[in-house]
Amino acid sequence: MARHGGGRGWYGKVVGAALGVTMLAVGASVWTAQADSVGGGPASEASASAAPGGAAEAVDVSIAHASDAGPRGVNITIDDGPDPAWTPQVLDLLDEYGAKATFCMTGVQAEAHPDLVKDVVAAGHRLCDHSVSHDTGMDKKSEAYQSKEILDAERMIIKASGGVRPMYYRAPGGAFTPYSRKLAASHGMRPLGWNVDTKDFERPGTNAIVATVQRELANGPTILFHDAGGDRTQTVEALRQVLPWLKEQGYAFGFPVR
């Protein structure tokens, strides 16, 4: 869970379709990231989230931050699970407040808890590949290693879900490389960043997690939480406050653009 600064506020632009790689410009995380949307609204994307099996269509290699729900959209993203102690509680809260989320699962956890993966899919949420082992040093490893971590996790998640593909790839700790982004995109998984790192994995207290969301939401729409990797009581309680607050502020729950 270290190195979380790596995926925050990266707004990549594709430069050279023939090469299929991008140059990353590290800039301020702002709502103008909505301009990075590569087509498709909530209706068209919702149907894609449940598409089982088959070959995946390639997607944009740039790191997504924007929401398909428009300028007042927010993306709830949940990392490192699923976990039987916490994922069901998170799912219950999302259902209570009519929120959708993107679950970035490790292959190990998905393989261990296929019932929870299926529960996530059945509730209308989206799946995201978070590598097999959550190695935050992946960007320093060989391309063969990166490929194995990403593609093995993809297979494990698809099997656990009963055939539903992950729609995104989030590098552990934001440890993306041009190679990993291109590989993921070629398998239909849009590289996924974040704008608000709640740092809930540090267990700073429920109030601190909530305050971080309220303070940093102006940075952009994609909010990072965790449902595994330790005691997530504070995360659950923070979501219990954050989800209704977002609705009261007029935000709509969406998914990251693809």
Predicted regions and their residues:
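N-terminal export and membrane-targeting signals
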Residues: 1-20
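N-terminal low-complexity, Pro/Thr-rich disordered segments
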Residues: 27-69
